Amino acid sequence: MAARNPFSPTFGASPPVLAGRDDLLDDLDDALEAGPAHPDYTTLLIGGRGTGKTVMLNEVEGLARRRGWLTLSETASTPGLIDRLERGVRRSLRQILDGPQRRIRSVTAGGFGLEFEATAKSDAPLELREALVVLGDVLASNGTGLLITLDELQSGEPGEIREFGTVLQHVTRREQRPIAFIGAALPQIEDSLLADDSATFLQRCARYDIERLDNEAARIAIAEPIERHGATIDADALDLAVAATSGYPFMVQLVGFHSWKTSTDPLSGINSADVAAGIDEAERLIGRLVLSPTWRSLSEVDQRFLLAMATDSGESRLGEIADRLGVSRSYVSVYRHRLIKAGMILPKGRGRVAFAHRSARSWLRNRAEYTQERLTDG
């Protein structure tokens, strides 16, 4: 029977080894311990596709549950966010109160005991703020809390996000109830919702940039799962794998998974040939799962900028990109900023940029050839 592949190349799935994130998790755990006055009690995690934002939400939810907290997880990009949050909070209340009309003095729910007296005021369903006030008071009486996590904030309906923020501003920040919030978003949120003067709650949240892993963290994230499953990877193969990931946690999982899968017998050792084949498959998937959706979200000028970069063999100079596009240096600087936010390129010193993903250049060149062929055939 083949040894089980230890890697998890699925968006949002927690990896077998979470490397390079201990300091951030410690900070957020400290915030849950400290309470609503802590600046990180309401936090935004900002990072590009494949950097592990959703995994971090999963991990913080785990920290909260280990403290005996309730958790409520939602995706902001799906319409009806406020309705779903209201239903989730009311459901938590029903579980604790054992029925909205029932007068009770003690109940055990979610592993903790509560001593209180509560009576619903009316038959009407509680709206989000009212429900959070009641739930927050119940949880505070027992020294616990509720953690709300929202993913894909950059794609949320602005009106709903503002409404949610207004509620949390009152319930958590002003009234100091134990309702913590962690949101995750792509960097574009800084030019949209976070630039909206009416979204003051989000603007006041603590912010953490979810950066790429350094080489040592990527090395640990690849080598440790292999070793834990009784397999080995030789030093050259590991170096090759680490370089191919560009520090992206999702790419770490893809390279690890397909290197293991390609190997005839991982328990006898994964070699450089296995890793090279695994990288080929991982880069194909990164093109489909990360580069292609990002490309479709870009403007025509953004796309032309990237195609102009793809003609270089290494780092690109903004002046040369401007010449290729026939525009001014100041003009391309605007799109440089946009593409950094989109997670497609990285700044590399004064006037220079590079692709964020190692495979982006070949992916773009293939796309340019395909587009040219279609134009020629047409």
Regions found by a protein language model. Name each.
Residues 1-43, 91, 98-99, 173, ...:
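A short, basic N-terminal segment
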Residues 38-59:
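Walker A/P-loop nucleotide-binding motif
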Residues 58-80:
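Conserved catalytic segments around the Walker B and adjacent sensor/switch elements
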Residues 121-187, 195-196:
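Conserved Walker B catalytic segment
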Residues 159, 325-342:
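Short amphipathic alpha-helical interaction segments
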Residues 173, 189-243, 255, 264-267:
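Helix-loop-helix "sensor" segment of P-loop NTPases
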Residues 253-327:
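Winged-helix-like regulatory helical subdomains adjacent to P-loop NTPase cores
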Residues 358-378:
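Short, amphipathic alpha-helical interaction segments positioned at domain boundaries
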